[in-house]
């Protein structure tokens, strides 16, 4: 037995010779009556002897000289034979080195002298141990008369316990002629020992069941181990990858099904067969440690691959995967297995389900649960389809081979989340606290902790490479204490049932050898045997007499300094001192204490006794002693650097390296400190977790469970390819917060993204800020004894922004360039905009930056409306996190946006990715409560909700290019002359859980919080202008017929009702508008089913004879404050309206409306808006024509740039051509030519003309009835929607949400397309 295959042994270093070695060379070990090599014997204070095994770090009382059946080296024999004239020398030699006697000829000269298996070491006094076979043959042939051979029997091999070479030769010469039945019937009864579910075939003969249905029987004695059986089966079955296999016990219990128990290779068959209820068990030879990739196993070992396929088929049929194996997967696997069986047997070229059912039966391929719960007709129908679909697994023209089908079978099966893994229930012990936990152990999960069984959230607790060793100790009743020593921190202590504990330890050790180090065993039965089946180790207090053998006693004192920054001196004391003095008090004192040991040894028993809960520094202190075999132990002030683990370099650390206060005692920095932290600390610590979640899948622990969400490495930051849960709120067991030693996965060898030689740097944190577990010069730094992570706000903001951006990122294929470019442009303009915006007055207004629209830079830039303080709307706490400014550029085009969750399906035209993303994200807004009505101001920065308190427009003249702050209520209640922006109501409160946000919004609040607190009301659009207009140039024109006069809301509800009922324009100052105290859902027009909105359109609309001819009535148009003429509008209309095909009925006009910043005079004289009206605005100043042309130019330029760059999804389902005269996509498309064009027919619909676009008149139904007697029926007839009407504007790009109710709709009957984003040009 290779003693080096169990644990990593600490080395004794020599700085003089620069060499290290442990243990000493075997040449210094004498075969006397002292303990065997690597053992020492000592006595406790009671005088009882016990032994220390340095190979396995065990301390048993049993004498290893009696336990170990020491093998007596075989003695060489000299054999002299004379040549027979017929038979020669009478033996057959092999070709090995040395040459082995294969067989002895009966009746020949060598019979009775040579034994099959003898190794020929000398021929006639010539050594031939290393000689080639030809030389041996020549020497034998050269002996004519006689020959003198020196032979030796080889050392007994593990398989010799079953059959020797000599016995094999005898069996060949005299084979057994009689075969006995396995079931021996005595007096009509079958013996209990030979039943099918029995371990023993007969006394001392173990029967092992293979997955292919065969059985193998092995005779054993008291020293035969499980490993002997495995090696023999490896030879018999020609298996190369034996590391995947193990023996298991299948225990059948009535009513509870079967249970598989892993057997450790060091267990003896005697121990196994003497277990209670062994007569109800079977021994199985199985692949217990499945490979990650079945193709890799196929390349390395085809025999093991075939065995894995057969075993997997049996597991599926026998329902060993439980409820996780769904019916659809079971049917697909059965279809593949049927195909493989038919192709392999080559009975027929055609895959016939009838033939398969007749030949094998469906029960051979399907679990009984499927056969019992599904109708046979449906099963056959599904299988017939799936058998034919198997051909789709290969390219067309090629036939699926049986080997390919097996690979696909195993790949389908490997998707099961319990494939090769197991779930364990255990009790986690932390000092005095005990908590029930659920662990998941598997090749893809390592040792994972099921944090929340309701949401099935799982986090990686420790990777297999992080586990140094596993120890088991018997507890009360049937419980066993399992200690998982992970890295160099405090071990994980679990209380489990004995069978589960054994399975956990064996499974972890098996995967460690498979995936990490095949030469090392991290779990040894010696540890379990010392505690569970034998007496416990000695007391490690008091004085002990150490009987040190010569192999490890150092004759002189040697002192050298430890590595690195350590100051601890390692002293080897003269071996004449034969005592070990350990104080009776706790081994982790605050003052300086010493442990004097004159012989180097590592003792787990000492470690177990010296370790106290919550005293991690002391434990790590002693672990350094145990691993390095140090002979001097100082207090915490001279802690040693722990011996690095075999994979210690591949450790990524979680918390920063924060200095520990000298006044803090080590026990206060344990698990309890982290458990007592509040949510704030947990929120800080979550930023330091990394959530890669490459391949984690769900796990069905119970039939009701939907599936466990695996978030690799991350406990609180649930970012991955699975459903994300509420971060810290969704965690029911905050236990991983205390034992999250392993931040990286054990896929460090395969797919670890962390460097193996460096500490992991989280975010932008510097490398010195990461905890380095390899050592410290002052205090031992333990992951469980660190203060909460700290950091400046910038780091927290950066980490949180990265976290939220990762969550809120659009799905793959649904991202447009506006996401990146907007954030870049905003970041670039942030410093100067912040400085410019300091003079503005409304810094305290919370603003939700939904979409920042960059515009082309041309002309003079105006200062932004406000510092865009990103905050959640309607939040209980207004947390302002970041200020973003962007210059308001009025070069000619300002794109205004309104999100409408109500839209019809695509009308057949092209729909770009941004439109679909926004539509799908906003569609869920219909389900949310509507409890806020808020106005939004659309500027170049985004949409700014205007506070209800600030409802006043400044009456003074604004600075050059400046735009006065606007408010929601003022915009809603002010007359047309006081309204610089267009007011467009939003019928729904946008409250979406899946809304895409800009990066600024994500800086402080999490996406979940944002979604839960987002409430959006009516949306106001404002478009600023770079030019100031004169009042005379913008004088409004109104048709003579005034019986359909539009109404404007007044300062109060009463005034508003009276003025609108009288059909006259009322005028109020901008200050009076703040008295509108009831701007609620009931008073807004869009909240009533029968209410309609009417848009004050351009002055050019007043002269549209087509519209007037329809009913003979038009609405008076409010006076414009900006210089906007009908000619300019008519010239700009073709370019501005050609993109709004979808969403407009034929003849429906959404005219572009450009608002110019008004001067003080405009605001002070609102009466001028009503002073003059005329039938047609026939006379237009030349200056206005130039302005209109300039607007037309900028509109066309901006439209082309937006369409080419893909900003804000301009390439939507509407016609995207700027010059197109009409969109013809579907019934939702409409003529986009100007109204005066003969192509646009007249309909009985009226829009309020507005030369300047300074406001929108919305008229409740009860107030509109007397003023608009002829239009109520018309609107109801043409637009039979229960929801409120919305204004009509020119919409170059319309975005729609699928399957939602209309919000910004048209008046056309049967319109299937409603605009989502409306844009206004300047």
Curated annotation (Swiss-Prot):
Main location: other
Domain PDZ: 78-155
All residue ranges annotated as the FERM domain in the record: 204-519
GO MF annotation terms: phosphatidylinositol-4,5-bisphosphate binding
InterPro entries: Band_41_domain, FAK1-like_FERM_C, FERM/acyl-CoA-bd_prot_sf, FERM_2, FERM_central, FERM_domain, FRMPD1/3/4_FERM_C, PDZ
UniProt-listed Pfam families: FERM_C_FAK1 (PF21477), FERM_M (PF00373), PDZ (PF00595)
Keywords: Cell projection, Disease variant, Intellectual disability, Lipid-binding, Synapse
Coiled-coil blocks: none
Subcellular location: Cell projection, Dendritic spine
Stretches for region Disordered: 809-847, 900-927, 952-983, 1027-1080, 1105-1148, 1160-1180, 1207-1227
GO biological process: positive regulation of synapse structural plasticity
All copies of domain WW, residue ranges: 33-66
Claim: Glycosyltransferase is one of the keywords in the record: no
Subunit (UniProt): Interacts (via C-terminus) with DLG1, DLG2, DLG3 and DLG4/PSD95. Interacts (via N-terminus) with ARHGEF7; the interaction is mediated by the PDZ domain. Interacts with GPSM2 (via TPR repeat region).
Function: Positive regulator of dendritic spine morphogenesis and density. Required for the maintenance of excitatory synaptic transmission. Binds phosphatidylinositol 4,5-bisphosphate.
Domain comment, as recorded: The FERM domain mediates the interaction with phosphatidylinositol 4,5-bisphosphate.
Disease as annotated in the protein's UniProt record: Intellectual developmental disorder, X-linked 104: A form of intellectual disability, a disorder characterized by significantly below average general intellectual functioning associated with impairments in adaptive behavior and manifested during the developmental period. Intellectual deficiency is the only primary symptom of non-syndromic X-linked forms, while syndromic forms present with associated physical, neurological and/or psychiatric manifestations.
The protein's name in its UniProt record: FERM and PDZ domain-containing protein 4
Organism whose genome encodes this protein: Homo sapiens (Human)
